[in-house]
From Swiss-Prot:
Catalytic activity: a 3'-end 3'-phospho-ribonucleotide-RNA + ATP = a 3'-end 2',3'-cyclophospho-ribonucleotide-RNA + AMP + diphosphate
Family: Belongs to the RNA 3'-terminal cyclase family. Type 1 subfamily.
Localization per Swiss-Prot or TrEMBL: Cytoplasm
GO CC, alphabetical: cytoplasm
SUPFAM superfamilies (UniProt xref): EPT/RTPC-like (SSF55205), RNA 3'-terminal phosphate cyclase, RPTC, insert domain (SSF52913)
Organism of origin: Escherichia coli O81 (strain ED1a)
Chief subcellular location: cytoplasm
Protein name (database record): RNA 3'-terminal phosphate cyclase
Length: 338
């Protein structure tokens, strides 16, 4: 019998990422875990619908036995079984992030006995989670270099707080993992601005694009009007394609916040990324830790190692026989496997 790993949900940033990473790693390694103080660092601690859906999805895919899988629970015991490929559908029942549920279960399906398709309904444009286009255009091309073949499709948008969106991913078992080397971003090839609107006047998008164009030379400017029943909602994105990597940044519009202020938030975030020679943005760094650990080799550079990143590394090191090195030089941190 494999040893039970005990995790403190309050460590580091104290959010849901500790639970999601633990679920992924438990499914992959077969190691059971207990976590207490789930989301202790949040204003509303314990399992929300999104986290509960991730737990139930993980349990279904690997036939796990679970204790504490209920809304508001701050303690969970997870004993995994064998991961099995298949066609899975999960509903969050709120505007909780579809992509964060997918993020939890897809790594385990890299080790399944056959190809899989996972469909999740809930929120797709959430201010605290990556949109499907980030997964599709930024993360999945990098995963392909590592040896992971998966394809995400956004079937229907669902903005916060209404939800109602649908995202699906097709994924195949990984034959072998490759080392990812992302030391330098390289020169910028082009930048693309994009605005999504659902039940929001078009002039909002035009003002947001104008704000982006006032700060950056945009090779593309796209406005997409979605059906009103997928809103109301508004998301502004800016994609930076460089020689070695494509990064994508986004901001979700808010009621009573002007189009110019929303877009200015995005401008500030992109300028912060471009001010550093680091290849990887803050959020993408979190996403690369697990596949890099599974490969057992690789490195990337990031401007600032967030608390989120360091917490994720700590969880990975509890489950896998790897050690990460974080070395800061001239304002850039190089993250690698020792």
């Amino acid at each position: 019998m494999k040893r039970m790993i005990a995790l403190d949900g309050a460590q580091g940033e104290g959010g849901g990422q500790i639970l999601r990473s633990a679920l992924s790693l438990s499914m992959i390694t077969g190691q059971p875990f207990t976590i207490t103080g789930i989301r202790a660092g949040r204003a509303k601690p314990g399992l929300l619908r999104q986290h509960l859906t991730a737990v139930k999805a993980a349990a279904e895919i690997c036939r796990a036995t679970v204790e504490g899988a209920e809304l508001g629970s701050q303690r969970l015991v997870f004993r995994p079984g064998t991961v099995r490929g298949g066609d899975y559908r999960f509903a969050i029942g709120s505007a909780g992030s579809c992509t964060l549920v997918l993020q939890t279960v897809l790594p385990a399906l890299w080790f399944a006995d056959g190809p899989s398709r996972v469909e999740v309904s809930g929120g797709t444009d959430n201010p605290s989670a990556p949109p499907a286009d980030f997964i599709r255009r930024v993360l999945e091309p990098l995963l392909a270099k590592i040896g992971v073949h998966q394809q995400t499709t956004l079937l229907r948008h669902g903005f916060y707080p209404a939800g109602g969106g649908v995202v699906a991913t097709e994924v195949s078992p990984v034959a072998s993992f490759n080392s990812l080397q992302l030391g330098e971003r390289g020169n910028i090839v082009q930048m693309r601005g994009e605005v999504l609107l659902a039940g929001v006047p078009r002039h909002v998008a035009e003002r947001e694009i104008a704000t982006l164009a006032g700060s950056f030379s945009l090779h593309e400017q796209n406005i997409h009007n979605l059906p009103r029943d997928q809103g109301p909602g508004n998301t502004v994105s800016l994609e930076v394609e460089s020689e070695n990597i494509t990064e994508r940044f986004f901001v979700v519009g808010e009621k009573r916040v002007s189009a110019e202020v929303v877009a200015a938030q995005l401008v500030k975030e992109v300028k912060r990324y471009l001010a550093s020679p680091a290849a990887v943005g803050e959020y993408l760094a979190d996403q690369l830790v697990l596949p890099m650990a599974l490969a057992g080799a690789g490195e990337f550079t990031v401007a600032h190692p967030s608390c989120h990143l360091q917490t994720n590394i700590a969880v990975v090191e509890r489950f896998l026989p790897v050690r990460f090195s974080l070395i800061e030089t001239d304002g850039v941190t190089r993250v690698s496997i020792e």
